Amino acid sequence: MRSGFPYPFLTTEAVAPVLAEHANDEIRETVVKGVQRGEVVIAIGYSEPDAGTDLASLKTRAERDGDHWIINGQKMWTSLANYADYVWLAARTDQNAEKPHRGLTMFLVPTDFEGFSHTPVRTMGVRTNATFYSDIRLPDKYRVGEVNGGWKLITGQLNHERLSLVTHGQVAALYEAVCQWAADTPAAGGKLLEQPWVQANLARVKTGLEVVKLICWKQAWSMDQDALGMAEASMAKVYGTEFFVELYRLLLEVMGQAGTIVSDSPGAILQGKLEFRYRVGSVLTFGGGANEVQRDIIAMAGLWMPRTR
């Protein structure tokens, strides 16, 4: 990501590892290897109009019909659905489960199947989508994991996603570009980089980046040891995403009004990358689960505090 090339990190870092572990051999051979070759993009279908943070209350249904599943429902905030080859979809397969999360199953839905459609949802930052599933007839081979065993896959995938949101390479490259810009920009008879307040801002950014890097390395090691916990992933997500928002603010202070010019406007500095990152940065604090909920997870799974008083 440091290089700046397009990189579908939700596909490669968040969904593909779960498919590699839990999908059947055909999916591993076609989809997972397609991801490795850079040929496959996967969107995530979790949130619904009435189910966001409370994901276990989702209503999209999958009903078995022989060797197929009939899927009906709607998802919201399905980023990349307009590009994706598949949607990693959570659907309810048991309407009478004792606990709602025990009636969910995971599917991989090809976006070229009849019955799938999407419409754009424009935000302040990037485009996302509403996706619709109308009597999609899906072969059972696209089911991932056990029937009604989807919750475990969802939580595992979300742990990966929360870490993927705080990879520091792209942000570190932006920091280095701003440092170089400040070193080249005249100010008060010298260079902007020589100003004490600029140095203070950049020092705060550099320190935070080093912390995020160490967190990422620690969690990467945990994944290698198959020991990544919910609390650890949530800690990384909360610290990293909130620091990134602060980082963009500090760098914008250094660049001033030049940093607020959008990429396709005359006078844009650094191709408008800082303006764009600052504008979309807040989505990281609720993508993959709102940070308020992550703090609850840290309290329960990391500090062993009770769910209720």
Positions of PLM-derived features:
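A short, Trp-centered hydrophobic/proline-enriched beta-strand micro-motif
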Residues: 38-46, 90
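Internal helix-loop-helix
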Residues: 1-29, 33-38, 80-86, 209, ...
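C-terminal helix-coil-helix/basic helical segment that borders enzyme active sites and/or dimer interfaces
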Residues: 183, 187-191, 210-266
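Glycine-rich phosphate/cofactor-binding loops in nucleotide/flavin-utilizing enzymes
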Residues: 14, 151-160, 164-168, 255-309
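A structural signal for short hydrophobic beta-strand segments in well-ordered beta-sheet cores
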Residues: 60-63
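Glycine-rich beta->alpha junctions and the first turn(s) of the following alpha-helix
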Residues: 116-211, 284, 300
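Short Ser/Thr-interspersed hydrophobic loop/turn segments at strand-loop and sheet-helix junctions
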Residues: 1, 90-92, 108-113, 134-138, ...
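A short core secondary-structure module
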Residues: 68, 72-119
